């Protein structure tokens, strides 16, 4: 995007606004970092204001829903960056957020090429419409070495190949991938490459995904190091259906978040083999009336809070669970919440003050101490 390319000091001719146009970019500094926020929703914004962000570690651009297609005539996305690479490397940029714009694929991927020379570690794209088809990367092209990539309400013209195309512009060290409100998660698995370092995948807030969609999204053998999977509000209906999808994907999962799904009874369904290392499961806010059958054998952390349980789980139902959260279930109203559970299981009946605002993924990573 022109505003991003401008930030990275590319040799572009920027559109200059009149002197009366207010500056769209502002700096905010504290003891920890320098942040820069730019609002380019004005009909004729001063794009050159983006240079103000050159000294910031945390940068956010808001496009106001405008289309950036006109920039295709002004920006050479394949320009030689040789004399600018050292300048780009010197920028302190670590986190970048881009919101609300209509962006041609060539501009987006050209920007990722520029960011490949920066120290960017976290990228968030939100409320974007990515238009047009993608070109193959140049032989010497490489994208940023991201640790975290977050996509929310991003639509792509290439509905089933967008992940594979985006993946070509990222270095292979991505550890956390979040995709929310996606328009398509039906990936072309033959084209998707392996994510060799991905440890956390968050597909929450995709209510149309469902268990069949999960099978399509979790391309087999593409996530060999996946440890945490978050599926909050993702249209899941049964724990057995999720188990089948995980078995097909062959992921070494350790923590699974199924909270905020309407789960139903799976009694009588065929047994399923969960990932052998799965030991943490979040089933809060799922409407359960009793403990589901066929839970992971090595489950040690279980969140059943804010369901419809009318009794305590029996010890034989959860033989390996050492940390159990039951906050907000009906049976607690008729019992003393301080009553000891004679099986020795540690029961959490209230959330810690600091945990309420944490994401489900982070809560799972922290194990039994925090739950959403």
From Swiss-Prot:
Membrane protein topology class: Lipid-anchor; GPI-anchor
Function per UniProt: Coreceptor for bacterial lipopolysaccharide. In concert with LBP, binds to monomeric lipopolysaccharide and delivers it to the LY96/TLR4 complex, thereby mediating the innate immune response to bacterial lipopolysaccharide (LPS). Acts via MyD88, TIRAP and TRAF6, leading to NF-kappa-B activation, cytokine secretion and the inflammatory response.
A cellular component term, taken from the record's GO annotations: extracellular space
Protein name: Monocyte differentiation antigen CD14
Subunit-structure text: Belongs to the lipopolysaccharide (LPS) receptor, a multi-protein complex containing at least CD14, LY96 and TLR4. Interacts with LPS-bound LPB. Interacts with LPAR1. Interacts with the TLR2:TLR6 or TLR2:TLR1 heterodimers; upon interaction with ligands such as diacylated lipopeptides and triacylated lipopeptides, respectively. Interacts with MYO18A. Interacts with FSTL1.
Annotated propeptide span(s): 343-372
Keywords, sorted A to Z: Cell membrane, Disulfide bond, Glycoprotein, Golgi apparatus, GPI-anchor, Immunity, Inflammatory response, Innate immunity, Leucine-rich repeat, Lipoprotein, Membrane, Repeat, Secreted, Signal
Lipid attachment site numbers (GPI-anchor amidated asparagine): 342
Swiss-Prot/TrEMBL LRR repeat ranges: 57-84, 85-120, 121-146, 147-174, 175-198, 199-226, 227-253, 254-278, 279-299, 300-321, 322-346
Gene3D superfamilies found in the cross-reference section: Ribonuclease Inhibitor
GO molecular function, a single term: lipoteichoic acid binding
Main location per the UniProt record: membrane
Disulfide linkage: 25-38, 36-53, 189-219, 243-272
Positions of the UniProt region annotated as Required for response to bacterial lipopolysaccharide (LPS): 290-372
